[in-house]
Regions:
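Catalytic-domain carbohydrate-binding cleft regions of carbohydrate-active enzymes
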Residues: 1-270
């Protein structure tokens, strides 16, 4: 009733206590790589193996039927701590060295194709991945700039990062507004310098193709953490969040141009 949609975070790695791990292990579709979280025996799955992609989706089916609208495919590089010999490992499609840059593409492709194949499905597939490559847009997938720190330098770097990304053919991109990790001002919402950085980032974020606030504790995510009505940092952020909602007809029209007229990157990252 409030036009709220649900996106959940799903990873490409599994721990040995999970049913996914056990099923993937039976078909030899787990990489012997160390990944996050460390020292827990967690392994990425072989996204190049179509049977492995089938298994991955099988465990998402119930969530999809419950009404999950989109997928946050985090750790899609995968989050891999490289060691000697990893590059020579043979995946389903060849050596890890030869195919690893296509890992996020195949991971997201598997999710997209399985969702679209669901009986009676009329929902568009939407995925946000931390890492990507040419062709992601074909599978309803976009990226953000990853887990960045909270600083003016980092915010400045996001501008060319976004422009370079969309010019590669994937028009939707975003950044963690305010930064993901703590930076030069800590995480004190009463610090005027931190307020200034957060507010300016929120103002800029209002005009990105996708607007998204995201951080890691103890950084601050919620508007109410920045004060109350009448406080500068609260009021300005609220104003631009509301402006974003008023811009939705324009944003939706832009999205139509991207799809129907192939105007790559026309979404507000370039306008």
């Amino acid at each position: 009733s409030h036009n709220t949609r649900l996106m959940i975070s799903i990873w490409a790695n599994f721990g040995p206590w999970t049913p996914q791990y056990k099923e993937l292990e039976k078909i030899g579709a787990l990489y012997p790589f160390e990944t996050w979280p460390m020292k827990r025996g967690v392994k990425p799955y072989d996204v190049f193996n179509p049977k492995a992609r089938d298994i991955y989706w099988k465990y998402l089916t119930a969530l999809y039927k419950m009404g999950v609208d989109s997928w946050w495919t985090d750790s899609s590089e995968p989050d891999h701590f490289s060691k000697e010999g990893d590059n020579d490992y043979m995946t389903y499609d060849g050596t890890w060295l030869g195919v690893k840059n296509a890992f996020p593409l195949m991971h997201n492709k598997g999710i997209y194709e399985h969702q679209r194949a669901m009986k009676g499905n009329d929902k568009r597939s939407m995925q946000m991945t931390r890492c990507g490559a040419f062709g992601l847009q074909h599978y309803g997938t976009f990226s953000w700039s990853g887990d960045i720190s909270s600083s003016w330098d980092e915010m400045e770097h996001q501008v060319p990062s976004g422009l370079n990304y969309v010019i590669c053919g994937t028009p939707y991109w975003n950044t963690d507004i305010g930064g993901f990790f703590g930076g030069e001002y800590g995480n004190d919402p009463k610090n005027p310098a931190m307020q200034e950085l957060q507010v300016r980032w929120m103002q800029w974020g209002c005009f990105m193709p996708l607007m998204r606030n995201h951080c890691s504790s103890p950084m601050l995510d919620e508007l109410y953490e920045w004060g109350k009505p009448g406080d500068w940092a609260f009021d300005v952020q609220k104003k631009f969040i509301e402006l974003r909602y008023r811009l939705l007809p324009y944003i939706y029209s832009n999205a139509g141009d991207v799809v129907l007229n192939s105007e790559i990157g026309r979404a507000s990252c370039r306008e």
